[in-house]
A protein has these predicted regions:
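Contiguous beta-strand segments within globular domains
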Residues: 78-103
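Noncatalytic modules at the cell exterior or secretory-pathway interfaces
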Residues: 82-87, 165-182
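N-terminal leader/pro-regions and domain N-caps
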Residues: 38-68
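Bacterial N-terminal signal peptides
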Residues: 19-31
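Short coil-to-beta strand junction motifs in C2/discoidin
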Residues: 101-113
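Exposed low-complexity, polar/acidic, P/S/T/G-rich flexible segments that act as propeptides
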Residues: 181-212
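N-terminal secretory signal peptides that target proteins for export/translocation
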Residues: 1-14
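Extended, solvent-exposed segments with strong compositional bias
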Residues: 125-166, 183
Length: 212
């Protein structure tokens, strides 16, 4: 079969066929070559303030602290990689649970946390979390090692936002730092920007990459 392009048409044998159709026929025979398979593995995390291990999920929860430097944040190591890598994690609200306040109808809280993922002086992403607490069913997990009933900590993750951050080639670590927290409760609203304050927690840190 011989084909000759003629403007908007192709000559296939003795028939003129619209070029779009012919291009479609060509594409049907294209073999797509996929890149080398990547790897996904748990991230190596340097956590300056560990909340603890979740009793339900088994995830390690790390506090996100307000900071002005990358060194003050949660450091996630990125293995040597070909092309861009991807760091993923779940960003949760940080709620202090009180069964008494919840029973009295005064446990409601709304959290708006603004964070940043940085590599050196470059901001790669600004993840934002909006989470609400109404009752105990809103808690994602509970953390052991506390003085509360059954040895539970009062602080627990609430809500959750799945975050994916693209990491450029040549970058071997990123830092997750807090910027601002806005909390709304039944008795008012507060905004926190003081360095060192915990404003959220992260868990389930993973790194996706292709080895060099």
């Amino acid at each position: 079969m011989v084909s000759v392009l003629k403007g908007r048409f192709c000559l296939i044998g003795r028939r003129l066929v619209p070029s779009a159709v012919w291009v479609g026929l060509i594409l049907l025979n294209v073999v797509v070559v996929t890149p080398q398979s990547g790897r996904t593995e748990p991230g190596e995390v340097d956590c300056p303030s560990l909340l603890g291990i979740g009793l339900v999920t088994g995830h390690s929860y790390c506090d996100v602290l307000i900071g002005t430097e990358a060194a003050e944040g949660i450091i996630v190591a990125v293995p040597p990689h070909a092309g861009p890598a991807i760091v993923t994690f779940t960003l949760h609200g940080r709620h202090t649970y009180s069964e008494e306040a919840t029973t009295r109808g005064r446990g409601y809280a709304r959290y708006l946390a603004i964070t940043a993922v940085v590599a050196g002086d470059e901001v790669l992403a600004r993840p934002v979390l909006l989470a609400e607490f109404h009752d105990a069913e809103d808690l994602v997990d509970r953390v052991g090692g506390g003085a509360g009933p059954a040895g539970l900590k009062a602080v627990a993750p609430v809500g959750g936002e799945d975050i994916r951050v693209t990491v450029p080639p040549g970058v071997n670590e990123v830092a997750i730092v807090g910027l601002q927290l806005e909390v709304e409760r039944v008795d008012g609203r507060e905004v926190f920007v003081t360095p060192g304050r915990s404003i959220a927690v992260i868990g389930d840190v993973q790194v996706e990459y292709r080895s060099r």
